[in-house]
Swiss-Prot record:
GO terms for molecular function: ATP binding; tRNA binding; tRNA-uridine 2-sulfurtransferase activity. One of its GO terms (biological process) is tRNA wobble position uridine thiolation. The gene is mnmA. Pfam families: tRNA_Me_trans (PF03054), tRNA_Me_trans_C (PF20258), tRNA_Me_trans_M (PF20259). It comes from Onion yellows phytoplasma (strain OY-M). Gene3D superfamilies: Adenine nucleotide alpha hydrolases-like domains, HUPs, Translation factors. Belongs to the MnmA/TRMU family. This is tRNA-specific 2-thiouridylase MnmA. The record marks 133, 349 as: Interaction with tRNA. Coiled coil: none annotated.
């Protein structure tokens, strides 16, 4: 029998993925990953589960029950050190540099599709690795007649997770299975219900990858001390004080502390200046300073040819694809141009590129411009 190792999280998606693989005749084994230790990692402020049973332990119990239901072996592995060093410290460093990172993408790059794969292939020797992501893999024949995996969008466009997988290398996609790629979320729930899986009605996980729900301001304060600074309008008018520019992101409306400032429209973050620790805000969700027409993208991971310079891009999860024109600067950096202008293109976030339903690659948004002038987004 062909052996598959599936990542089991305790949620319904990975449970149905394991169920489908077994139904298709694979020899299935599962692995549960533990990647965060609240006490060891000083996760105190903003942690609503600090005095309760750790949510990861509850997820592990659900994974055990699912594996027992399906009659598959469950392994448990800790990647706490790897997660801290490769994901979380990169996450914190980005905030220190006034960027807005995406921990889910870092987590996929370094843990789920690196540390996990290394563990599974070394210890369990499967032919395939499977995950419960909403994505697809298709294969193209290269010039030397080898089959090359390409990351393709899921059928369920609302749940498609290729954005979070967009920085994986071609090597990381080798021998990967995504059993849910051609199913909708509703169909996945229905399969779980029809087969009495214990977590069929369990709500989807939210929050930071493997950490969970947190009060974001308080959570970051465990690792980034508050740095009081000025909140100003673009013309320099002082409005109030903030807790530190790294706590805010471009386009943010809530938790600005401007409730006492008279205004006709809601305030939005339109700029951040780290050297002076100044947060810039303006009124209205369509303020011109929120828009840009060019961005510099770095740390590129690209899969396939670079010949097509007219692609679509996604600068945040679930954003409708945007038409962009690429100008390659070197192997690792490019500029994207979008004359139609796009709102809240945020340094630190990932820009994923698409050619129809194929995700070609992605990079980190470094700088943002409008009509040749750099926006004060960092």
């Amino acid at each position: 029998m062909t052996k598959v190792v599936v990542g089991l999280s305790g949620g319904v998606d990975s449970a149905v993925a394991a169920f489908l693989l077994k139904k298709q005749g694979y020899l299935v084994e599962a692995v549960f990953m533990r990647n965060w230790d609240s006490n060891l990692n000083f996760d105190i402020q903003g942690n609503p589960t600090l005095n309760d049973i750790c949510s990861q332990e509850l997820d592990y119990k659900d994974s055990l029950k699912v594996s027992e239901q399906l009659g598959i072996k469950l392994h448990r592995v800790d990647f706490i050190e790897e997660y801290w060093q490769k994901v979380f410290m990169s996450f914190i460093k980005a905030f220190e540099n006034n960027l807005t990172p995406n921990p889910d993408i870092l987590c996929n790059n370094e843990i789920k599709f690196r540390a996990f794969i290394e563990y599974a292939t070394t210890k369990l020797a499967p032919q395939y690795i499977a995950m419960g992501h909403y994505a697809n893999i298709i294969y193209e024949t290269s010039s030397d007649q080898k089959l090359v995996p390409r990351l393709a969008c899921a059928v369920d466009q609302n749940k498609d997770q290729t954005y979070f997988l967009s920085q994986l290398t071609t090597k990381q996609l080798q021998n990967i299975l995504f059993p849910l790629g051609n199913l909708t979320k509703q169909e996945v729930r229905q399969i779980a219900l029809e087969n009495n899986l214990i977590n069929a009605t369990k709500k989807d996980s939210t929050g930071i990858c493997f950490i969970g729900e947190r009060n974001f301001f308080q959570f970051l304060s465990n690792y980034l001390p508050a740095q009081k600074g000025d909140i100003k309008t673009l013309d320099g008018t002082f409005l109030a004080h903030h807790k530190g520019v790294m706590y805010y992101t471009i386009g943010q409306r809530k938790n600005l502390g401007l409730g006492d400032v008279p205004s006709q429209k809601p305030w939005f973050v339109v700029g951040k200046h780290l050297p002076t620790n100044t947060l810039y805000v303006e009124q209205g969700s369509t303020h011109p300073y929120l828009y840009s027409d060019k961005a510099l993208i770095g740390d590129i991971v690209w899969r396939g040819k670079k010949t097509n310079l007219h692609l679509q891009a996604k600068m945040r999860y679930r954003q409708p694809n945007q038409d962009v024109i690429l100008t390659w600067l070197d192997q690792n950096n490019l500029e994207i141009h979008y004359p139609q202008t796009i709102k809240a293109v945020t340094p630190g976030q990932i820009c994923a590129f698409y050619d129809k339903n194929i995700c070609c690659g992605a990079g980190v948004i470094k700088e943002v411009y409008f009509q040749g002038t750099k926006r004060l987004y960092t």
